């Protein structure tokens, strides 16, 4: 490019963020030598007045307009007015919308920014999963007040897998084990009872689960952890804590994690 010569300009116009159109323009521009082009992004274009302003600016700069406008009225208006002003345009998303509509036999939703809402939903899920890992097994009481939901119960009542499963439903879940020798965190009693779910299980089933756990670890099943009297003591203690909090309680006996998680989800949404 000659010294002092103005770089070619491309206006990127979008009814959302405009990142997609800008990436396409820059990818195309990278195929050319020289000093490149100047990209001027105009996001969130939702009215005809803004379209008129952009067309005027593009005309003055002898620029072209690349756009991703999904709302038909605004897209049509831009095309008509740009043609009248003799400003070149490139419709980046329109042809793809038409082809996919033809392929799927469906009409587009014509909603700006859907892809970013999908991304936001994905990151909420990731955040919830990280939260469940960080505040698993009562390892940090601060998680109790930060959580959408707190699960409480004795060991091996599916608190951890439930926390992970509910995280995939975008819920931030902390869980706290209840052990007779350890006083629960005081934060637990400051929460609304609606934010706490107690998990109970039949002594016999818990005995079997714990015995199998000890076997997996190579330990003797006679250990206190799988002793039926000790289990009944733990369950009675946990029941007392749940009554003290006044939280709803779910019996997880003979229930799959998915079934219990769906019950919790429906309770939480009420």
Curated annotation (Swiss-Prot):
Q: Which EC class does it fall in?
A: transferase
The alphabetical list of record keywords is: Kinase, Nucleotide-binding, Serine/threonine-protein kinase, Transferase
Taxonomy, superkingdom: Bacteria
For this protein, what is the EC number?
A: 2.7.11.32, 2.7.4.27
Q: Which GO terms describe its molecular function?
A: ADP binding; ATP binding; phosphotransferase activity, phosphate group as acceptor; protein serine/threonine kinase activity
Any idea which positions bind ADP?
153-160
Q: Does the keyword Lipid biosynthesis apply?
A: no
Q: Which reaction does it catalyse?
A: N(tele)-phospho-L-histidyl/L-threonyl-[pyruvate, phosphate dikinase] + ADP = N(tele)-phospho-L-histidyl/O-phospho-L-threonyl-[pyruvate, phosphate dikinase] + AMP + H(+); N(tele)-phospho-L-histidyl/O-phospho-L-threonyl-[pyruvate, phosphate dikinase] + phosphate + H(+) = N(tele)-phospho-L-histidyl/L-threonyl-[pyruvate, phosphate dikinase] + diphosphate
Q: Which family does it belong to?
A: Belongs to the pyruvate, phosphate/water dikinase regulatory protein family. PDRP subfamily.
Briefly state the protein's biological role.
Bifunctional serine/threonine kinase and phosphorylase involved in the regulation of the pyruvate, phosphate dikinase (PPDK) by catalyzing its phosphorylation/dephosphorylation.
Q: Which NCBIfam families match?
A: PRK05339.1 (NF003742)
State the protein's name.
Putative pyruvate, phosphate dikinase regulatory protein
The organism's lineage is: Bacteria, Bacillati, Bacillota, Bacilli, Bacillales
């Amino acid at each position: 490019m000659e010294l002092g010569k103005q770089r070619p300009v491309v206006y990127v116009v979008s009814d959302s963020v405009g990142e997609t159109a800008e990436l396409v323009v820059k990818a195309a521009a990278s195929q050319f030598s020289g000093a490149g082009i100047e990209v001027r992004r105009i996001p969130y274009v939702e009215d005809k007045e803004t379209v008129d302003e952009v067309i005027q600016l593009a005309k003055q700069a002898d620029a072209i307009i690349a756009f991703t406008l999904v709302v038909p009225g605004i897209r049509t208006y831009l095309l008509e007015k740009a043609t009248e002003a003799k400003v070149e345009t490139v419709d980046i998303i329109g042809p793809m919308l038409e082809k996919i509509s033809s392929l799927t036999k469906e009409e587009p939703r014509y909603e700006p920014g859907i892809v970013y809402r999908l991304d936001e939903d994905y990151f909420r899920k990731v955040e919830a999963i990280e939260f469940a890992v960080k505040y698993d097994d009562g390892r940090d009481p601060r998680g109790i007040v930060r959580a959408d939901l707190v699960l409480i119960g004795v060991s091996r009542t599916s608190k951890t897998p439930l926390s992970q499963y509910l995280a995939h439903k975008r819920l931030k879940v902390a869980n706290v084990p209840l052990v007779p020798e350890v006083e629960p965190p005081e934060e637990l009693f400051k929460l609304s009872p609606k934010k706490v779910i107690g998990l109970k299980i039949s002594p016999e089933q818990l005995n079997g689960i714990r015995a199998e756990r000890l076997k997996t670890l190579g330990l003797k099943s006679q250990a206190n952890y799988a002793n039926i009297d000790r289990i009944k003591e733990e369950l009675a203690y946990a029941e007392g804590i749940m009554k003290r909090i006044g939280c709803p309680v779910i019996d997880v006996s003979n229930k799959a994690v998915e079934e219990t998680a769906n019950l919790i989800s429906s309770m939480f949404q009420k």
